[in-house]
């Protein structure tokens, strides 16, 4: 995209925003976090070789190739069979605990060591030094942008932040008690109606072969997502939508739309805007999680990007995914006071209550994002005052980490534990994790379009139903 005069005029602002060492910098006074940057080589050496399998049912031996990444192709196991009526081995993997449907270069996780990197960069380092819009560029295009690229990128997102009036009218027609993320799912899906020229179902599969068409949809989604989310939030508050301002950063604009009530002179607190920016960075991408897998699954059919993204948002809406942030707040509210923690701990150990905000399917160590969020929480509470639930949260964390039951199960605080308290203090729905995660969905969508291995996702099943049966009339069935 060509740089504009308006974009050049913003470079000075961007320079100030990205420089963290200036004495008058408005970024939170948070110490640099310990990062996982000590490993600069590839995560592991080549694991390429062959796997020898002996089928004790038949005595047959098989050689299965192992890739340099330590994976085998499941179709190679189909040749392991007991005879002509056996169609070969199939893998049963509920929840995809050990199945990789894609190869990706976007993010790397080592759950045992508590490592998360975006395109090789430790997430803690990006949270300390970068901005959300810069990270979105990194995730989508693979490298950090130059100063000029960043200015163009932010300008393009800003220029595409206005939402079609028809979408805003749709949000306004929703019930007053609509959940903001439910509204976000509906509105994001509806965008495909307003951009038919970029819909493969209407224009043919080749429409996304154009990188210009792809890039246009990416900046549209990134630009409009916070505008839609803010409109959904305001709808629940009984207020009309607020249009974004072109002179504010991504996170500042989100706070402006949520807080200003249309007062164009309103200025969001820059320290809180930076906190939100860091939260967005931490939640932007997390490899093949449920919602990202849902987005890639939908895009594999050749559908439009808006449907794929709305599907991802719908998945993160679930209480076991992004909804866990709200569940954590509800849990702390139910506990109420520090004095009730021992009783709560015992009820969890007796499987009568659920401990939200602890543990993770991937991380068997501290969630690296959780450490950053805890420091952010202190910053927010120094500005807005300390939420009484923070005392409950601190005490619950100490109690859980000193109890052998939780330590043995490696149940450490995750990113949800304190981010919910931050959102609550700032008056932002915890469920709006979805806004930041859209960058990850778009990165995977773009990557899948260029991956020659991309196929329409069509998992197998293990059939456990009845054998063949033949139809009988109602009268015949009644006789039985």
From Swiss-Prot:
Transferase recorded as keyword: yes
Active site: 321, 360, 416
Reactions the enzyme catalyzes: oxaloacetate + acetyl-CoA + H2O = citrate + CoA + H(+)
Pathway: Carbohydrate metabolism; tricarboxylic acid cycle; isocitrate from oxaloacetate: step 1/2
Gene Ontology CC annotations of this record: peroxisome
EC number: 2.3.3.16
Record keywords, A-Z: Peroxisome, Transferase, Transit peptide, Tricarboxylic acid cycle
Major subcellular location class: other
InterPro entries in the cross-refs: Citrate_synth-like_lrg_a-sub (IPR016142), Citrate_synth-like_sm_a-sub (IPR016143), Citrate_synthase (IPR002020), Citrate_synthase_AS (IPR019810), Citrate_synthase_bac-typ (IPR024176), Citrate_synthase_sf (IPR036969)
Cellular compartments annotated: Peroxisome
GO molecular function: citrate synthase activity
UniProt entry tagged with the keyword Kinase: no
Tissue and organ expression note: Expressed only in siliques. Not expressed in flower, stem, cauline leaf, young leaf, mature leaf and senescent leaf.
An example Gene Ontology biological process: tricarboxylic acid cycle
Protein family per UniProt: Belongs to the citrate synthase family.
UniProt miscellaneous comment: Citrate synthase is found in nearly all cells capable of oxidative metabolism.
Protein name: Citrate synthase 1, peroxisomal
Gene source species: Arabidopsis thaliana (Mouse-ear cress)
Phylogenetic classification of the source organism: Eukaryota, Viridiplantae, Streptophyta, Embryophyta, Tracheophyta
Gene label: CSY1
């Amino acid at each position: 995209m060509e740089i504009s005069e308006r974009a050049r005029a913003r470079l000075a602002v961007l320079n100030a925003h990205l420089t963290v060492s200036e004495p008058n910098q408005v970024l939170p006074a948070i110490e640099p976090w310990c990062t996982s940057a000590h490993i600069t080589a590839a995560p592991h050496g080549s694991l390429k070789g062959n796997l020898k399998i002996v089928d004790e049912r038949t005595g047959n031996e098989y050689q299965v190739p192992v890739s340099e990444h330590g994976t085998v192709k499941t179709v190679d196991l189909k040749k392991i069979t007991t005879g002509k009526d056996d169609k070969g081995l199939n893998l049963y993997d509920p929840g995809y605990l050990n199945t990789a449907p894609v190869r990706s270069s976007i993010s790397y996780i080592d759950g045992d060591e508590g490592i998360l990197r975006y395109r090789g960069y430790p997430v803690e380092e990006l949270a300390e030094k970068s901005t959300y819009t810069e990270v979105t560029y990194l995730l989508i295009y693979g490298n950090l942008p130059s100063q000029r690229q960043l200015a163009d990128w932010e300008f393009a997102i800003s220029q595409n932040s206005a939402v079609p009036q028809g979408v805003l009218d749709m949000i306004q027609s929703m019930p007053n008690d609509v959940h903001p993320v439910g509204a976000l799912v509906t509105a994001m899906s509806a965008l495909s109606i307003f951009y038919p020229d970029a819909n493969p179902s209407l224009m043919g599969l080749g429409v996304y072969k154009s990188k210009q068409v792809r890039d246009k949809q990416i900046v549209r989604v990134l630009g409009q997502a916070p505008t839609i989310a803010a409109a959904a939030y305001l709808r629940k508050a009984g207020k009309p939508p607020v249009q974004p301002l072109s002179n504010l950063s991504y996170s500042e604009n989100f706070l402006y739309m949520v807080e200003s009530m249309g007062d164009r002179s309103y200025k969001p607190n820059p320290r809180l805007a930076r906190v939100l920016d860091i939260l967005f960075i931490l939640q932007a991408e997390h490899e093949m999680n449920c919602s990202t897998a849902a987005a890639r699954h939908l895009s594999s059919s050749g559908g439009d990007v808006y449907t794929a993204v709305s599907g991802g948002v719908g998945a993160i809406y679930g209480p076991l995914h992004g909804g866990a942030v709200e569940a954590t707040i509800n849990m702390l509210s139910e506990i109420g006071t520090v004095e009730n923690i021992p009783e709560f701990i015992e009820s969890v150990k007796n499987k009568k209550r659920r401990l939200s905000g602890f543990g993770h399917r991937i991380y068997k160590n501290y969630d690296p994002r959780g450490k950053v969020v805890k420091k952010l929480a202190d910053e927010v509470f120094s500005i807005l005052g300390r939420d009484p639930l923070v005392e409950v949260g601190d005490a619950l964390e100490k109690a859980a980490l000193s109890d052998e039951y939780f330590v043995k199960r490696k149940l450490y605080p995750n990113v949800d534990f304190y981010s919910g308290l931050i959102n609550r203090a700032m008056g932002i729905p915890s469920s709006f994790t979805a806004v930041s995660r859209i960058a990850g969905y778009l990165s995977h969508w773009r990557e899948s379009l260029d991956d020659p291995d991309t196929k329409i996702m069509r998992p197998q099943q293990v059939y456990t139903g009845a054998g063949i049966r033949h139809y009988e009339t109602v009268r015949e069935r009644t006789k039985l």
